[in-house]
Amino acid sequence: MALPGPAVFGPGSRGSLDEAGAEGREAAALAAAGVALEDEEEDDGRRGLLRWDGFSAWLHCVCVVGFDLELGQAVEVIYPQHSKLTDKEKTNICYLSFPDSNSGCLGDTQFCFRFRQSSGRRVSLHCLLDEFDKDLPVYLKKDPAYFYGYVYFRQVRDKTLKRGYFQKSLVLISKLPYIHFFHTVLKQIAPEYFEKNEPYLEAACNDVDRWPAPVPGKTLHLPIMGLVMKVRIPTCHDKPGTTQMVQLTQQADTHTSIILPTVHEVDLFRCFCPVFLHSQMLWELVLLGEPLVVMAPSPSESSETVLALVNCISPLKYFSDFRPYFTIHDSEFKEYTTRTQAPPSVILGVTNPFFAKTLQHWPHIIRIGDLKPAGEIPKQVKVKKLKNLKTLDSKPGVYTSYKPYLNRDEEIIKQLQKGIQQKRPSEAQSVILRRYFLELTQSFIIPLERYVASLMPLQKSISPWKSPPQLRQFLPEEFMKTLEKTGPQLTSGIKGDWIGLYRQFLKSPNFDGWFKTRRKEMTQKLEALHLEALCEEDLLLWIQKHTEVETVDLVLKLKNKLLQAGRESLPVKPDTVEKLRTHIDAIILALPDDLQGILLKTGMT
């Protein structure tokens, strides 16, 4: 199937998406979500699109964004054609796929952006991937409200064009936060695409459609235009801070393989290098969800630095919004730059000088220069007062009046400085810095984990004939009292006002998100234990002492328990589920024939 001639979509565009194709895309999503379709025509459309299920597990669509003299930045191609994007989403993609004009990015540039999914979608694409989400670390789970855009932008002089420059971006739109993986994919396909155009893009998309599903924990072999990428997506069961390396097999095609040591991590030290003296303070700001702006000379620097900041509190998830690259055209521009209220909990990466004035009321601003290649170390920036920041041309520095709660760890600074003097590779420095952040985060979170675990009711309080007991309430003062004996001092030598840091954290979006996640996990555990308790009962003996109405009610409740276990992915052993099914079947068979028939006809078994 050949691609048609490019249709242009963008700000002020005269084109429109093929609505039938868009409806078909939604039909595929509905089908995957288990939502019934209303008529035969839609059902036929769904069956015709099943071939794109493999593609949809990895990508929402691929866009080509070019510069039109009449329309400005415009989406020239969306592939597959049935992919659905709203006008608002297309406008955001248009502006976020090009560097600001002041960046002067000649040649090839790669960066990443993140944008809000338009409201009003009946079924979001993320429903296709939920089955894999449960095994992912929390920081790699998809956010149903956001898309990622991975960009390969080319700008070269071309005298044959009126504008004098060839300017085009190949953009991968995905729900998956696999930054390193998608940048690697773009490195393989974008240069060839700019030479060979649409037929090459179609062939690459067909390759993606044949990929296995993104299952966490498995070594995946992903062919793309003659090469094979070998990757492993982490699982929530991996030990934090360890990387399960993909092994190179002794096969004839080894010379064509690319082995990715990570799917999501950025070069942490390269990003923190200009500010590594203040890395612990930045860790605190990110942990507390403070409003933070990264002002950088190009989208590459801004996006890498924002992603490094978000990554520094791993394995905690950063629950607030973050925008690796943000422009004045963004649909949330007014929301995030208004002075009528306090700046929101968000990390923004910007390159336009206009932001130096627009965001000067924000409490924490990082101004960085060009990130140096590995081996070249920029001069360390200082912490400066916010009033000294007037323009984006201001000197690099961390502009804030924030006073850290913890004393600076001089040991990590000495370690990194020694690495600089010895010309230690950036990758090795990143390992040291990542381990430091991990140990710091774990020292902080372990006391919280220990206290939250104590909120779980005792297993002996779970009765099969009563609703599962509730978790005890989280009481901040009760938690604070536990810190004297089981606080972070057990695992960290860093001194300072840990209590003050905890008090501030308990008010933050990161605590709110973390606690909601833990509470959900513990509630599901209680439901699973309740299910196991039911399975251990002699239910046939129970029904002998109760009426038929009570027995039917029990069957319906047990069926609902089974449905809940599947729907919510409760941590129930397979043999427990099988045991419960056997109980249900035995109870139904003990009922009169007419009741058996009713339960069977209504699909209750």
Curated annotation (Swiss-Prot):
The gene is Dennd6a. Residues 1-20 are annotated as: Disordered. The modification N6-methyllysine is found at K507. GO terms for cellular component: cytoplasm; recycling endosome. This is Protein DENND6A. Keywords: Cytoplasm, Endosome, Guanine-nucleotide releasing factor, Methylation, Phosphoprotein. Transmembrane segments: none annotated. It comes from Mus musculus (Mouse). Residues 392-525 form the dDENN domain.
